[in-house]
């Protein structure tokens, strides 16, 4: 196959919604067929003259052992031999037309006299030229007959139209024959699904055959009106007089041959019925896909290839989707309209016969074109527009303004000022406390023993912290969705995001960490659960977090041979306290994989990818601002030097020496001190001696 000379480029689009809603409309049409070029062949020396081989008797006898095949118009395409040629023979009966002109009548009489000789030459021509054309019915090989039988509509000029959804399977003829058989009870869900779709395609073919039989047999019954494709026969410019029917034989061929009309049944779904267009998806074998498919699968792309069975599998469209970035790559790019048929495919056979097809496809769902250069500029423009729309632009008071205009001007200014203040009126954390919001994303998991995994997580908050969340919603523990057919050597894209908000007291120490525990569980087709591994990560609440994704190595207990048999045949999860296993404060010894105790050895399994982000919020310490403006001079002489005043301000504004100055903080400190005094007095009264109690009573 040779690609056309048109420029093909890869279209890159950003998918804003669900990729499963993507639909393509593809149109394919047979344009034309190129006949073989003229051929000059040497038939061998023939000694038919009386002067010997080296001395021909006449000028015409020079060319008697040579003949040429010249392609003519469509009306003469085929000839007697049906090879797609109009043969001009240079022999004694016809003569050398380049040097001698003869009338058509005399030429026809000469042809009738030399009919036997022409029959012999025709046999020689059919043996020497094994080329065939799709335009010829008599000389078409069995493969061409089968292609024409399956795709009569396409060969007769109809446009194949099909709509393909994302990851929608369309079978080729070989796949249809493979999945039409009953897969049995041990088949997978994918095989059963393909078998069901193959039966639907078979029913579509049988329904079409019944329509054809009804159209031929029942003449009085009202049947769907057939489509009539009429074509004007091209005639030669100079019509020869007295030419018999033998000079222009009539043959049956395709639409580009000499045919006046072809009747076919109206079938808009003939592309799906004839398996003309088929697709290859992620579930199919990589051996059927192009060479770059395995490399794309390793990078996490989802692939889809669209082929056309044009006497050989021809790749029309290749689509790949990056779920991490949300980008869709389409090669070649979408046409402005599927009816434009922008792309051309040229099919070459072993002989000089060529088939020309054109196709176009468009997207029927909205997509946003992705441009790296214009994306930032467009975003900046949108931000400026939002800022201008959200906040009124400052305007000046007109010089000659009436009283009503002045009142309206200041009213708008007050509304704008209140709107600006409302932007800062968000909920603050309690005093002497800090709010920490953690944004967690469990991205993917891979290299576990079994597929169909999901992850359960649990967070353990440190001391001097309080969980802050929506009532009835517990984000400290949860589970992800199950990834079907992923998690072993295939990457399971979990994509689970959640948020945890904590309040930290003043007594919180930076060494106190938030512990995050993971348990990876697989579920097989019999709904048996198996533990695939445990993981742990300690999150600091006050210090910085890594900006990149974190790769966590999962482990699980190795166990003995009985545990291995139970895991394989029965499944289930062992009672393993992984929280205490990862707690370093409760252990006096280090874990080792070389421990001979069967309860202690662990084995590594797969990995999890975790991404963290953190937001901190606290109230502004007003003591620094207060001491910055009002500093106290306690027993120190003031000097006029500016440097000494600045030093006094810095010393007085030190957080270690500063005290609470607001009324709320003073009252809170007073209440706390009163509680401590009452508690101390209560303890002292209980432990007092009887003599001291007696003296207190007398007093």
From Swiss-Prot:
Disruption phenotype: Viable and fertile. Minor defects in sensory cilia function probably due to lack of localization of the tectonic-like module proteins, namely tcnt, B9d1, B9d2 and TMEM216, to the transition zone. Does not affect the recruitment of Cep290. In sensory cells associated with the notum hair socket, results in structural defects including axonemes with abnormal microtubule connections to the basal body (BB); results in subtle defects in the localization of intraflagellar transport (IFT) proteins and an increase in the ratio of cilium volume to inner membrane volume. The keyword Membrane does not apply. PROSITE patterns: C2_B9. Residues 108-119 have a biased composition (Basic and acidic residues). InterPro entries: C2_B9-type_dom (IPR010796). Its main location: cytoplasm. GO terms for cellular component: centriole; ciliary cap; ciliary transition zone; cytoplasm; MKS complex. The keyword Cytoplasm applies. Residues 434-560 form the C2 B9-type domain. GO terms for biological process: axoneme assembly; ciliary transition zone assembly; cilium assembly; non-motile cilium assembly. Expressed in chordotonal neurons in the antennae (at protein level). Expressed in spermatids (at protein level). It holds the Pfam family B9-C2. Keywords: Cell projection, Cilium biogenesis/degradation, Cytoplasm, Cytoskeleton. Probable component of the tectonic-like complex (also named MKS complex), composed of B9d1, B9d2, Cc2d2a, Mks1 and tctn. This is Tectonic-like complex member Mks1. It comes from Drosophila melanogaster (Fruit fly).
